[in-house]
A protein has these predicted regions:
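Bacterial Sec-dependent N-terminal signal peptides
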Residues: 1-33
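Extracytoplasmic cell-surface/polysaccharide-interacting catalytic and binding patches
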Residues: 25-106, 110-238, 248-263
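Conserved metal-phosphate-binding beta-hairpin within the catalytic cores
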Residues: 243
Length: 263
């Protein structure tokens, strides 16, 4: 009887551990259960936000994989109607401050996420390591949740973006590139995002000498953050560029249709 009880206990532990692995994800990427290819509730982002600038990194080759990502058939961006409406309010807000929104990614089909997973499993493919994860061994990308099996982007109300300065005609200097894998991308790196106070605390940087960002670069991140939060988006605690609509319409659905102009 003791042996049988022990076997049942071990089986239960394995099930729990397996579930933890399968749901590895960032804080805004809850478990989703319903796949669909229905794009009827989506809009082309630039139709809703005509002042936005697009630089769809996963359509090109300058990204952490180094090739075009599966599912990105055209260099466009799609969002749910609700997220696009809120983003228009963000755009109007930052335009009044002299900035435009620059979009790196929005809706991401599940096949794009699957592409990331295959890439992460190939530890020999480190082509883009010098540009996006020079301080990390590729083997930690799964354990540290830089790459996960599911993404909030597949739900259609998440996007990655920065600010473009209309006076200088350049991106605002955020002190780090989009998709940089490391603590330097965290909103609380060198400051407190809740108060907007710059502290200069770079102790989490794994580099030697440690990387840092300036007070001005931290404030640039805060300008974007304040505008997004003011219009209904939630931030992610590991990426300064990543936001999800708080009241997203499809919290339990992930979409599979490709990224291309909607008809």
């Amino acid at each position: 009887m003791k042996t049988k009880k022990l076997i049942w206990m071990l089986a239960a532990i394995l099930v729990i551990c397996g579930a933890c692995v399968m749901t590895c994800c960032n804080s805004d990427e809850d478990s989703v259960v319903s796949p669909t290819d229905d794009s009827s509730q989506f809009v082309t982002l630039t139709d809703a936000v005509p002042d936005a600038i697009l630089e769809i990194r996963y359509y090109g080759t300058y990204n952490f994989v180094g090739t075009r990502i599966d599912g990105y058939e055209e260099p466009t961006a799609l969002l749910t109607k609700q997220a696009a409406d809120s983003l228009k309010a963000v755009s109007d807000d930052v335009m009044a401050q002299g900035y435009r929104l620059k979009i790196y990614d929005a809706y991401r089909p599940q096949k794009g996420v699957d592409h990331f997973v295959r890439w992460a499993e190939d530890l020999n493919d480190t082509l883009m390591k010098p540009y996006f994860y020079p301080d990390l061994d590729k083997s930690v990308l799964f354990p540290q949740e830089y790459i996960c099996l599911k993404s909030g982007h597949t739900r259609g109300s998440t996007l990655d973006l920065t600010l473009f300065d209309m006076a200088t005609e350049k991106e605002l200097d955020m002190g780090g590139t989009f998709d940089w894998f490391g603590p330097e991308s965290h909103p609380d790196f060198c400051g407190d995002p809740e108060t907007g106070e710059y502290t200069g605390d770079n102790s989490k940087s794994p580099a030697e000498p440690k990387r840092s960002i300036t007070a001005e670069q931290f404030e640039h991140r805060m300008i974007l953050r304040r505008a997004m939060l003011a219009h209904g988006f939630n931030p992610l605690d590991t990426e300064w560029w990543h936001f999800t609509l708080k009241d997203e319409p499809f919290p339990d659905t992930y979409f599979t249709f490709p990224v291309k102009q909607l008809k």
